[in-house]
Regions:
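Thiotemplate assembly-line natural product biosynthesis machinery
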Residues: 1-21, 72-81
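Phosphopantetheine carrier-protein modules
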Residues: 14-33, 52-60
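Catalytic nucleophile serine of serine hydrolases
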Residues: 36
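Conserved catalytic core of two-component sensor histidine kinases
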Residues: 40
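AMP-binding/adenylate-forming catalytic domain of the ANL superfamily
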Residues: 57-69
Length: 81
């Protein structure tokens, strides 16, 4: 699978929840810009958009706090496939 770009992840996130500055945010979970329901929607979107499953061990705030960390998670999962 090709490397997933930051822009592709931002586009996916904007489909899940609009009105958030995903490009510059570094504490999406910590600042409550996204909540647990949003995280579930993001996990579902990752499955739909990239055909990847997020294991329970990776559902931690650090992986969802920034677009960069989420992009890194998605690319790691893609490499492991």
């Amino acid at each position: 699978m090709e490397e997933i770009t930051l822009d592709a992840v931002i586009e996916m996130l904007e489909d899940v929840k609009e009105g958030v500055d995903y490009r510059n945010a570094t504490a999406l979970v910590d600042n409550r810009e996204i909540d647990s329901f949003d995280i579930l929607a993001i996990i579902s979107a990752i499955d739909d958009e990239f055909d990847l499953s997020v294991p329970a061990k990776d559902i931690v705030p650090a992986n969802f706090n920034s677009t960069q960390s989420l992009c890194a998670l998605i690319n790691r999962l893609a490499e492991e496939e």
